[in-house]
Amino acid sequence: MLVPRISQRAKLILSILSALLATLILFSSPGLGSNGKPDDETIRYKGQRLSIKWDPLTRAPLIIRGIESNLLEIKNFSKLSRKEITHTGPLLVNKYQSLLQIEPDQLQLKGAEKISDTWYVSYWQTFHGVILYESSLGFSIDPRGHIKSLGALLYPTVQAPVTSKISHEEALKIGQKQIKDYKKLKCMLLAESVLIYPVKKTNSIDYYRVYAFNFFPEKALHPATTEGGWAVFVDSQTGKVVLFEILMKPLGCCVPEDWVPPKPEEMKPKW
């Protein structure tokens, strides 16, 4: 069976929507945080009434909504370019900085896409220029330039190394050794990065500066197979493997009519 290949634009839209859903659809029931404060509360912030859902561990907002008001109203929105629209995130952080507890320059653009008349924009949080794994801040902008709510997974008080003690080459060898029959399977490194990897515990968070690698066997590149790959995170200070995870592919056996093997830079990494 032959099917058309999904476009890069469609993939980008799906990734942005997934990020927004992951941050906005969280913990629907109220509760108490670790310090006794409610996880959901209504506050007055600089004269504006807001509904906030707090992360019980980080005490950073998961969701902020304006009550009978917008978080931000962008003037002449219809005339703005995509690049100008991507500057909205830092403006939003600057306005609600004491709630979000990060700096505007800690944002790094993840994606911005227009669907119908609505823009969907998302960012990573960074620490000294390094992305925090699975961090996010996302929101939508309606045709009038109004932002009604935001969703976020942020880490206000990151304590992590700012340099690496072991080399990239050492970390890569450690990562490769985690995969049985690495050479026999003709595994390839299809994505890599340096990340800050937060590990949540009961009452605290450990932060690791890691080399993140995504490996895939050669046969996994063909869309007719469900063969997956592996994500390996190696601590840049000790060489310890702090994450080893199987990367699954969606089930299916349809080969696009114009299929060609993807280039490494076209493969979506796990972060």
Q: At which residue positions do the language-model features occur?
A:
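N-terminal secretory signal peptides that target proteins for export/translocation
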Residues: 1-9
